[in-house]
């Protein structure tokens, strides 16, 4: 029986295979084990991948918008951005707040008098950094912006700098989506107010204005009305012809005191409903 492989239980069994100790039988056994191991490993990888996709689908109601891979966190390389990051990180640990307003210069540059009048009383902390892309938000969420007590609500307004850097609307939307996934993972009990990108450039037919509209059409599908609420508050900035006037936006990107006053009047009721719905987990 030299070199024969038996299937059955014996004192020297490995599973249900008995191998007589010859070079040929050992080689055959190793071949069988290798094939079974590879098959099992492939099955494990498939299960893990599908589980990851299922988890992402459970967290958000929108799928990824491109096939370019998930955006990666990126640190700011300039001194001003890093100093502003440090101030925000200190504020989240030392300043009482209930809502974190993440954004770029449109958030950081919010008229301070109007902020103190309308947003500060609602417990909103300004976490905007001028020049930020979606990648930068991802990075700072993992480097101190969430180091304080968990926020009850998060307001997110980001993406216009991505578009200005000639990123596609789809890739910009993927960056926003990645932020939402991270926020849902890190702050599962918080409600997120996802703001549509605000209009820029004077004409409704301008390239970046159209790109803003494309991004908004994509990201609105990421809202479920419960954990993530979507709102477009920028239309109030436009005149009857859809144009952005210098009175509300002198450079057709950033806003004047009048522009921020108009935005605040549009944001306040949305924010109030969001916070009021935090206990019932339903915004109506």
Where are these regions (language model features)?
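Short amphipathic alpha-helices and their capping/turn segments at secondary-structure boundaries
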Residues: 86-100, 139-147, 181-184
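N-terminal secretory targeting modules
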Residues: 4, 14-101, 106-113, 117, ...
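A short helix->loop->beta-strand "cap" motif at the edges of active sites that frequently abuts
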Residues: 187-190
């Amino acid at each position: 029986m030299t070199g024969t492989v038996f299937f059955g239980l014996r004192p020297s069994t490995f599973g249900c295979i008995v191998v007589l100790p010859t070079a040929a039988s050992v080689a055959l056994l190793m071949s069988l084990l290798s094939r079974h191991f590879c098959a099992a490993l492939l099955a494990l990888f498939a299960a893990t991948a599908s589980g990851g996709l299922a988890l992402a689908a459970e967290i958000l109601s929108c799928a990824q918008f491109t096939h370019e891979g998930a955006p990666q966190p990126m640190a700011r390389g300039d001194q001003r951005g890093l100093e502003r990051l440090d101030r925000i990180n200190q504020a989240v640990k030392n300043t009482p707040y209930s809502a974190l307003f993440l954004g770029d210069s449109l958030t950081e540059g919010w008229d301070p008098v109007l902020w103190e009048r309308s947003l500060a009383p609602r417990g909103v902390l300004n976490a905007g950094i001028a020049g930020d892309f979606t990648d930068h938000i991802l990075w700072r969420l993992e480097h101190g912006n969430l180091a304080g007590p968990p926020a009850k609500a998060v307001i997110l307004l980001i993406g216009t700098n991505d578009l200005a850097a000639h990123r596609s609307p789809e890739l910009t939307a993927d960056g926003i989506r990645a932020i939402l996934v991270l926020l849902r993972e890190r702050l599962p009990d918080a409600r997120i107010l996802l703001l549509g990108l605000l209009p820029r450039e004077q004409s409704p037919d301008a390239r970046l204005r159209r790109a803003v509209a494309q991004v908004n059409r994509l990201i609105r599908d990421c809202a479920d009305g419960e954990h993530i609420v979507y709102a477009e508050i920028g239309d109030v900035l436009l005149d009857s012809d859809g144009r952005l006037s210098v009175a509300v936006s002198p450079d057709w990107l950033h806003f004047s005191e009048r522009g921020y006053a108009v935005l605040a009047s549009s944001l306040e009721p949305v924010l109030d409903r969001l916070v009021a719905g935090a206990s019932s987990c339903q915004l109506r």
